Every structure is written in structure tokens, then in C-alpha cells.
Amino acid sequence: MDVYLVGGAVRDKLLKLPVHERDWVVVGARAEDLLKQGFLQVGKDFPVFLHPSTREEYALARTERKSGKGHTSFDVFASPDVTLEDDLARRDLTINAIAQSEDGEIVDPYNGVQDIKARKLRHVSEAFTEDPLRVLRVARFAARFAHLDFTVAEETQQMLQEMSASQELSHLVPERVWREWEKSLLTQTPTVFLTLLRDIQALSQVLPGITADDSQLQRLQRTSAYSDSVTLRFASLFIEQETPESLKQFCRQLAIPNHYRDSALLARNHEDFITTPELPEKAQLAALLKQIDYWRRPEKLEQLLQLRQAEYSESKQQKSIAAQHKKLRSGAEKAAALNAGTLQQQGFTGKALGDALREQREQILAEALN
């Protein structure tokens, strides 16, 4: 029985990047062999085990054969006769098909080390086309490693284009599409994910409604340079969305979590506030705070201010926008602290109470912004 470190951990070590989790493959063993050593089996579709002390994942060497449509229809075969090379052959990219033995020896049957040096994302074999999810994985890796100058190999780009044309991507479940996109939004260059899918004519299949036009991409890049927040990055893509209904439909179609949808709707509904360098007049500001329910949900104003700051983060107005926001935050906090009970004690009731509360809040905002 031989044990090898595989996949992303080996790749990231070779790239001198932090290794966050380690996966292992076990060659020449049966499930019973690991169970006897105290491993806990967790994989239902294929034999994966948790180490009794480290809780890291150990998988028996296996091969796969496509048995139907989509990315889940595979027959898995695990046996002591499956070699390390057989196991690595089923992986997507050569940079992910490198192993390291327990004594530190690199095993690289598909020239992944060479592709790391050449900064190329290249498929391991023709079996790559059997799993449509790999199109999104390559796009995600392209986004993740773009800052290290990685690009997709020409023959792999051609294969991605052919997979897109085959309509295999239509068999992907929405949750998996979203998961890959969400991961790409965590990278330094999330625009690369979208541009690659656009270039291979896959964008309309997996993310209908995302155009990846210049305006959308530039705004996403600005927001990404300004903030690590996936929520802000996602919301920035929908600032110019035509209707709230189309945005809601898009989020339903991809099973996108509600907090992302709500943030995108907030951005879309307040496009003018985000994209106009001058703040609105005091009455409009007070109305905005009421509309977004600032008095109970102050985080909504903060999101709008962050998106607005990102919008001007590369302009000469950056400092003046930041100064505006500092004053607005202060004024909004003071306005929120205004107590309606005090006004009631002064004799205000009903509509008069509401009018007085609004007028005093407007006055507080005006004073804060002067």
C-alpha cells in the first residue's frame, strides 16, 4: 500500500502558494485495509476515507467511465490493481495531476510541472470532455491564476469551445454552476471567469442574463480591486440590470442564495445614487434612508456607499467621494438616533409627528453634509 499527496496541494506547493487542505490517494489497498486502521468511510459513490487523527481525505486509487449525461453520470472502479497513473489520468488539468510520495518524490506522468513552469492550463486527456463541469472549473482556475500569468492552452481552449457547442453544459445543475461562479468571485481577477465563458460561447448557457460587456466587466474589476467582498462583487454586476423581475428570475434559475439576490436588487434599484458623483439633496437622502429601511437595516446604506466608493475608486474624485461618505455616515447615525418619543412629548401626533420626524432628519443630514 502506497500513499501519495495529490491534486491542489502539490500544485500549490510547486507554485509556492499556501496549502489550505491536503488530499491523498492510496494505491494497492482495499477499503477493508483502511477501515482496519481506523479510517472512517465517508464517500458513497466512491471510496473516500477520513484519517483517524488528521481528518484529511484519503481516496482509493480509482478510474471513472462516463455512463450518461451531465457531470454526475460516471461509473467508478476502485481496486488495488488501479495504478497511480490511472488515477491521475482521470483528473482535469495537468497541473492538478501531479502526485508526491511520502518521501517527497514528485510523480508527474502528464507533464504538469512543465505546464506550471509554462503557466499553462492544459487538459490531461480526451476524457476531459466527459464532464461538462470541467468547463467551469477551467474558467475558475483561469481566474484564480491569472495574476500568475496562467493562460488556457490553445488545444484546451478549442476543446472547451467544442464542449460548449455540444450543449452538454445544459445538463449542469444550477447549484454547481453557482458554486463554481461563487468561487471565481473570490479570486483576484473574477472577470477572467466571465470572459473565458464568453469567448467559448458558453456564457448564455450557464449564466443567461450576464453579458460580460465592457461596462459590466470594468465595474466588476473596479469593485474587485476595491473590495474582497463576494457580495459586493456580485451586486456590482447588476447595477444596470433592466428590471428587478429579470434579476429575480436569473437568481431563481441559478438557485443563488437570497442574500446575494437582495444585495443585487439594492444595487440595481439605486443605480443613480451609486453612479452619480454628487450626493442627492437632503430630502432625497432622507427618502433614500427610509426606502432602504436604514433605521432598522443600516448595513444597506453601507453596501451602497461601498459600491459607490468602488465606482469612483480609480478616479480623481475618490477622495472627495470618501469625504462625502464620512459625513453621510455621521449624519445618518445622528438621524437614526432621533427619538420619536421626544417629539410626542412635545405634542406631535399622527401625520404631524411623521412630518416633524422627517423634517428634523433632513435638517440633521443637511448640517452633516455642509
UniProtKB/Swiss-Prot annotation:
**Record Gene3D superfamilies:** Beta Polymerase, domain 2, cca-adding enzyme, domain 2
Annotated positions binding ATP: 8, 11, 91, 137, 140
The family database entries (Pfam families) matched by this protein are listed as: PolyA_pol (PF01743), PolyA_pol_RNAbd (PF12627)
Residues noted as binding Mg(2+) in the record, renumbered to the chain: 21, 23
GO biological-process terms attached to the record: RNA repair; tRNA 3'-terminal CCA addition
Q: Which UniProt keywords apply?
A: ATP-binding, Magnesium, Metal-binding, Nucleotide-binding, Nucleotidyltransferase, RNA repair, RNA-binding, Transferase, tRNA processing
Q: According to its UniProt record, which reaction does this protein catalyse?
A: a tRNA precursor + 2 CTP + ATP = a tRNA with a 3' CCA end + 3 diphosphate; a tRNA with a 3' CCA end + 2 CTP + ATP = a tRNA with a 3' CCACCA end + 3 diphosphate
This protein's cofactor list reads: Mg(2+)
Q: Does the keyword tRNA processing apply?
A: yes
The remark listed among the other comments is: A single active site specifically recognizes both ATP and CTP and is responsible for their addition.
Against HAMAP family, the record matches this protein to: CCA_bact_type2 (MF_01262)
The name this protein carries in UniProt is: CCA-adding enzyme
